[in-house]
């Protein structure tokens, strides 16, 4: 769309469009089998509420959706079809009402949202947009969408901390900390949460050459994982089970998860799961107050089990920060293979032994969180 000038106009002949969709769907079924393709969530179009992606109006999009839905379902009712894939949570009530009236109910609801959308002044720099983004805006928008989706899956198929392809905020620990906090804020509302985008290679906006230029990828041009990539890695290590954590702070948030629990009872039998991973973030929007914070968490003993050791993994200015390693090389525009390898090493997560203190009832875990950082502490139980 940006460089290749893709056609974003409504179909001139709806019948021709339906035939195209039908033949494409039949090809998928023939090549991959209905068992496979029925697992593919198929969105109809992308951000039709933005003129750069769709030259028609809302009515034209809804007609396109209906024609596409009918064509796909005619090939197989097992196809999963949804939308409206709009930017900024737009058109969700209208889309839902139309689908109900026309009996073309989506199998899932999808939309996009960025925290910078909330400020509403597109021309403002992203730091200012984030500064003025209302607290909890991503959860608020997800809750609105969840109400409309009902029991159907809700997919946010595009998000990031900003929508800019050139923003230095994307390359540092702030991005990782904010991404983790936003992800956890909607964990109970959203079924899929898709980061835009995997790589900084985004030639449609002009092919970049500088290894760190503020691209919105999880990895830089050379495939070096950026801090946000590692942030999602720590989220995976947190596990899917949750334990309640009591306490609050303006910039620090904490979650307890089951991690990779491998505990056994004293008789060798499998013991009940316990919190084995603690994830902290210390993050504030640009131009808001933030400082290093000393945090302390007490973990009660669980019957015969108690925390016997801990390891901490950090993401901050001195941990998992390949941009700092690049700057230490003199910020070269073009990297040698050896330079790329140095950045790969600098991007790695490092587990460090972390001391704990215990009494007869509980174990205490303490650490200092620098501004705009996150840390995961893995607990080992006896």
Regions found by a protein language model. Give the residues of each.
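Surface-exposed, active-site-proximal loop segments in enzymatic domains
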Residues: 1-15, 48-55, 119-127, 164-170
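Beta-strand-rich recognition/accessory modules
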Residues: 356-382
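Acidic, Ser/Thr/Pro-rich beta/coil linker or hinge segments at domain junctions
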Residues: 302-360, 364
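Carbohydrate-binding surface patches
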Residues: 250-306, 310-328, 371-378
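Noncatalytic carbohydrate-binding groove/subsite architecture in carbohydrate-active enzymes
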Residues: 21-24, 58-193, 211
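Aromatic/acidic polysaccharide-binding cleft in carbohydrate-active enzymes
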Residues: 156-266, 270-290
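Substrate-binding cleft of extracellular glycoside hydrolase catalytic domains
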Residues: 1-31, 37-39, 156
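Active-site flanking residues adjacent to catalytic metal/cofactor-binding acidic residues
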Residues: 42, 46, 157
């Amino acid at each position: 769309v940006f460089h290749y000038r893709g056609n974003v106009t409504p179909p001139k002949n709806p019948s021709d469009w339906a035939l195209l969709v039908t033949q494409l769907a039949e090809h998928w079924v023939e090549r991959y089998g209905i068992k496979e393709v029925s697992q593919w969530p198929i969105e109809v179009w992308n951000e039709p509420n933005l003129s750069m992606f769709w030259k028609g109006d809302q009515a034209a999009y809804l007609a396109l959706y209906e024609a596409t839905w009918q064509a796909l379902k005619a090939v197989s009712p097992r196809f999963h079809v949804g939308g409206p894939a709009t930017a900024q949570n737009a058109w969700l009530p209208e889309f839902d009402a139309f689908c109900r009236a026309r009996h073309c109910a989506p199998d899932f609801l999808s939309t996009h949202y960025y925290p910078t959308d909330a400020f509403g002044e597109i021309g403002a720099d992203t730091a200012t947009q984030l500064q003025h983004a209302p607290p909890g805006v991503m959860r608020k928008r997800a809750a609105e969408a969840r109400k409309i989706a009902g029991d159907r899956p809700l997919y946010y198929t595009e998000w990031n901390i900003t929508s800019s392809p050139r923003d230095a905020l994307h390359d540092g620990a702030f991005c990782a900390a904010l991404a983790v906090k936003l992800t956890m804020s909607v964990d109970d509302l959203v079924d899929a949460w898709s980061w835009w985008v995997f790589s900084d290679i985004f030639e449609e906006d002009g092919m970049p050459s500088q290894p760190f230029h503020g691209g919105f990828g999880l990895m830089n041009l050379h495939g070096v994982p950026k801090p946000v990539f590692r942030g999602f890695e720590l989220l995976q290590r947190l596990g899917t089970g949750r334990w309640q954590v009591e306490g609050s702070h303006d910039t620090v948030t904490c979650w307890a998860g089951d991690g990779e629990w491998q505990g056994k009872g004293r008789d060798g039998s499998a013991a009940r799961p316990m919190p084995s991973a603690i994830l902290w973030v210390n993050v504030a929007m640009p131009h808001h107050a933030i400082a290093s914070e000393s945090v302390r968490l007490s973990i009660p003993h669980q019957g015969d089990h108690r925390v016997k050791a801990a390891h901490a993994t950090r993401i901050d200015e001195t941990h998992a920060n390949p941009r700092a390693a690049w700057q230490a090389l003199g910020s070269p525009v073009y990297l040698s293979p050896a330079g790329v390898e140095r950045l790969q090493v600098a991007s790695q997560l490092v587990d460090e032994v972390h001391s704990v203190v215990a009494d007869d009832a509980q174990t205490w875990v303490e650490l200092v969180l620098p501004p705009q950082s996150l840390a995961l502490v893995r607990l080992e139980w006896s």
